[in-house]
């Protein structure tokens, strides 16, 4: 039997979020709907999840000692990583001491960089992937590019949102890609993965929920990337029954190997009926923001239920749905928004503004959501709604 206490009392059920961006914010909201006390942690103040949490802490999550001090003081029932850049060795230690890490400390450790999860998927589980090599020095990198061949993609083993990622098409690009990867990783310079091109038709995110009652799959999500970052997503993405079955088989294999309860975003390349594993995140996925409108239970509601050991009944899809990012570019310490009434004027549209306190360069500030009679119609509506929002810097 699951028991949930009352926030801000001795009986409280406490969740501590490591990472307080827009995805963590939605998890916090869903947890609070269920009566959970939420503590939000991030490296900067007034992060989106901090704005809705019961309390918050500002600290570098790569500082294991500082992280330990907060966790020992708060004594959360669940530690919920929402980003990759965390002192995972500390999480492994804390888990051994009796703290619960979602889904597991091992999952957080393996997925904090591309090497751990790629070796698990390709070498231990035997899942098909693109050709790849890892390199830690410039000499190893040149050897890796020669072995994989051109064109190839170079990424820091620890980065997100396309940072430090580039495509090498000619010899002239080789050193530029290395230098860019050394400045774009979350932990500074270091190891990279060199990946060969997969000739795929499209890529999907297969959201997979591991919960007390088993494993549940959301409908496949298609997405559009620009500069390595998500710009649009839609659900359901049409695909053959054979490809869908193989996608779910692979998703179940890799999430089962990682273990624990929660939602996983499994990224896959599809070529005809063939499926290739790309990456997995043991947490809500940015492309899954579309589920705020596309499903009766969003990926965030599913994550909260799974974490708490609550039932996840059959999912209901609300029909063709899409999301489109509201993007800002420039510098501001107090951004504002106009055009919201125009964005929400069409039927079956929605808007989620993330409340990010600062903009420096390009930043994802919100997402427009839409339902339609077809995926094409839903995407067009979401794009119109996003375009109507003006971010004042």
UniProtKB/Swiss-Prot annotation:
A Gene Ontology biological process term: 'de novo' IMP biosynthetic process
Keyword match Nucleotide-binding: yes
Chain positions recorded as ATP binding sites: 114, 155, 160-165, 195-198, 203
Pfam families, A to Z: ATP-grasp, PurT_C, RS_preATP-grasp-like
Magnesium is among the record's keywords: yes
EC number: 6.3.1.21
Binding site for N(1)-(5-phospho-beta-D-ribosyl)glycinamide: 22-23, 82, 286, 356, 363-364
Sites where the protein binds Mg(2+): 267, 279
An annotated GO cellular component: cytosol
Entry-linked InterPro entries: ATP-grasp (IPR011761), ATP-grasp_carboxylate-amine (IPR003135), ATP_grasp_subdomain_1 (IPR013815), PreATP-grasp_dom_sf (IPR016185), PurT (IPR005862), PurT/PurK_preATP-grasp (IPR054350), PurT_C (IPR048740), Rudment_hybrid_motif (IPR011054)
UniProt keyword terms in alphabetical order: ATP-binding, Ligase, Magnesium, Metal-binding, Nucleotide-binding, Purine biosynthesis
Superkingdom classification of source: Bacteria
Reaction equation(s) it catalyzes: N(1)-(5-phospho-beta-D-ribosyl)glycinamide + formate + ATP = N(2)-formyl-N(1)-(5-phospho-beta-D-ribosyl)glycinamide + ADP + phosphate + H(+)
Molecular function as annotated in GO: ATP binding; magnesium ion binding; phosphoribosylglycinamide formyltransferase 2 activity; phosphoribosylglycinamide formyltransferase activity
Record domain ATP-grasp: where: 119-308
Pathway given in the UniProt record: Purine metabolism; IMP biosynthesis via de novo pathway; N(2)-formyl-N(1)-(5-phospho-D-ribosyl)glycinamide from N(1)-(5-phospho-D-ribosyl)glycinamide (formate route): step 1/1
Subunit structure: Homodimer.
Family: Belongs to the PurK/PurT family.
Function: Involved in the de novo purine biosynthesis. Catalyzes the transfer of formate to 5-phospho-ribosyl-glycinamide (GAR), producing 5-phospho-ribosyl-N-formylglycinamide (FGAR). Formate is provided by PurU via hydrolysis of 10-formyl-tetrahydrofolate.
Name of the protein in its database record: Formate-dependent phosphoribosylglycinamide formyltransferase
The organism of origin for this protein: Nitratidesulfovibrio vulgaris (strain DSM 19637 / Miyazaki F)
Gene: purT
């Amino acid at each position: 039997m699951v028991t949930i206490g009352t926030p801000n009392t001795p009986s409280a059920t406490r969740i501590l979020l490591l990472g307080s961006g827009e995805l963590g914010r939605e998890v916090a909201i869903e947890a609070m709907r269920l009566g959970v006390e939420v503590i939000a942690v991030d490296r900067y103040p007034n992060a989106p999840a901090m704005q809705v949490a019961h309390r918050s802490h500002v600290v570098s999550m790569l500082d294991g000692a500082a992280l330990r001090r907060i966790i020992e003081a708060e004594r959360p029932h669940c530690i919920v990583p929402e980003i990759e850049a965390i002192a995972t060795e500390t999480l492994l230690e804390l888990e051994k001491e009796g703290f619960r890490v979602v889904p597991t400390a091992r999952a957080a450790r393996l997925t904090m960089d591309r090497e751990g999860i790629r070796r698990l998927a390709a070498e231990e589980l035997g899942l098909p992937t693109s050709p790849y090599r890892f390199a830690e020095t410039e000499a190893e990198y040149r050897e890796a590019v020669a072995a994989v061949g051109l064109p190839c993609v170079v990424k820091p083993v620890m980065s997100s949102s396309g940072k430090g990622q580039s495509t090498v098409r000619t010899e002239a690009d080789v050193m530029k890609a290395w230098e860019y990867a050394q400045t774009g990783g979350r932990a500074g310079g270091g190891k990279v993965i060199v990946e060969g091109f997969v000739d795929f038709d499209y890529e999907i995110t297969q959201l997979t929920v591991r919960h007390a009652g088993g494993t549940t799959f959301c409908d496949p999500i298609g997405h559009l990337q620009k500069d390595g970052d998500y710009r649009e997503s839609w659900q359901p993405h049409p695909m053959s029954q054979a490809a869908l079955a193989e996608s779910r088989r692979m998703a179940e294999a890799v999430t089962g190997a990682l273990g624990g309860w929660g939602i996983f975003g499994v990224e896959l390349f599809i070529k005809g009926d063939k499926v290739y594993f790309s990456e997995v995140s043991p947490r809500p996925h940015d492309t899954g923001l579309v589920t705020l409108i596309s499903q009766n239970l969003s990926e965030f509601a599913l994550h909260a239920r799974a974490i708490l050991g609550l039932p996840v009944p059959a999912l209901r899809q609300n029909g063709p749905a899409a999301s489109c990012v509201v993007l800002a570019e420039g510098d501001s310490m107090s951004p504002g928004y106009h055009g919201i009434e125009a964005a929400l004027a069409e039927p079956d549209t929605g808007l989620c503004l993330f409340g990010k306190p600062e903009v420096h360069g390009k930043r994802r500030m919100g997402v427009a959501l839409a339902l339609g009679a077809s995926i094409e119609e839903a995407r067009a509506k979401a794009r119109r709604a996003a375009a109507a929002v003006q971010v004042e810097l």
